[in-house]
Amino acid sequence: MNLNFMPLLHAYNHASIDFHFNSSARDFCVHEVPLYEFSNTGEHAVIQVRKSGLSTLEMLQIFSQILGVKIAELGYAGLKDKNALTTQFISLPKKYAPLLEKNTHNLQERNLKILSLNYHHNKIKLGHLKGNRFFMRFKKMTPLNAQKTKQVLEQIARFGMPNYFGSQRFGKFNDNHKEGLKILQNQTKFAHQKLNAFLISSYQSYLFNALLSKRLEISKIISAFSLKENLEFFKQNNLSVNSNALKALKNQAHPFKILEGDVMCHYPYGKFFDALELGKEGERFLNKEAAPTGLLDGKKALYAKNLSFEIEKEFQHNLLSSHAKTLGSRRFFWVFAENVTSQYMKEKAQFELGFYLPKGSYASALLKKIKHEKGEKYDKF
């Protein structure tokens, strides 16, 4: 497979929308929503921290330096953007809590502010969040483009959007996935095991994005072309589909088509199950009750069946499925933005947007859906 970045297909077919977005603390805000309520008792202090101009890892280093706590003792649910105003929850051993108030000024000098202090019985771990609330401000937005943007947002609110991994996964030079493959091939290795694991996960992410783009292409072809043309397309691609199955696929109201053998998952979380009754699953997908998932290949990955598997197998890799430390998983192909709000200020030519996404989903993916830039290969922030 070609490992160079290829343009990823967009979900919707509107023309490009021109505006300016600057990923900065003024124009981009991220607010973490915790997975559970904190009990206010326990051996771990839980602080809600607001930061700007710092990555999560840089923030942890500052806490370590100022409080004397080891970085390994700090818990966090996920990485937050550096070029944004973000809030997130951090856990640390209870004994360090008294030092927080004493060092308020030192922390504020480093662009960190403690918003709240609580306690809990366990350390926060990666993935311990429901999702994130986002705010974005677009500039140089004309009234016509504001109207187009609202129309796109209506589509996204109704149908959702592709759950592509964002550029954070692939690094400054968009080559993390290549390094991950080299690690699997024993061509390179780093001393830090977490770095090796992250780079391998970048390769998984690259394959997932490519698979999702392929599935979008197939969905668009099913919707746009006649039954006869579709039968010819599937035949040329060595995919076995009869005319009745294709009719059923064309009748699915959602733009992303559920295929026979897809691995579904209750949305926004729940158990995996196979798509057997496509009409029924299509309705559940449309109602945001369940969604199809894509492969993150690994030793214990759950694979699709039938037609879905025939497409998916092109994006599997035996080095992932045989790698002892890469267990594999599945990820929603599609996610639904919630609580979408927008406001256009004509006199300032500015458009403000707020929305919520579940954990693991990227605001940059929604930005791409709106801008719809031709030839776009990866996210701008």
Swiss-Prot record:
Any GO MF annotation of the entry: tRNA pseudouridine(13) synthase activity
Entry keyword Isomerase: yes
Record-annotated TRUD domain positions: 160-335
Signal peptide start and end residues: none
Entries under InterPro entries matching the protein: PsdUridine_synth_cat_dom_sf, PsdUridine_synth_TruD, PsdUridine_synth_TruD_CS, PsdUridine_synth_TruD_insert, TruD_catalytic, TruD_pseudoU_synthase
Keyword Isomerase: yes
EC number: 5.4.99.27
GO biological process: tRNA pseudouridine synthesis
Catalytic activity: uridine(13) in tRNA = pseudouridine(13) in tRNA
Domain of life: Bacteria
Enzyme class at the top of the EC tree: isomerase
Keywords (A to Z) from UniProt: Isomerase, tRNA processing
A single cellular component GO annotation: cytosol
One Pfam family here: TruD
Active site per UniProt: 81
Function comment: Responsible for synthesis of pseudouridine from uracil-13 in transfer RNAs.
Family: Belongs to the pseudouridine synthase TruD family.
Identification of the protein by name: tRNA pseudouridine synthase D
Species of origin: Helicobacter pylori (strain P12)
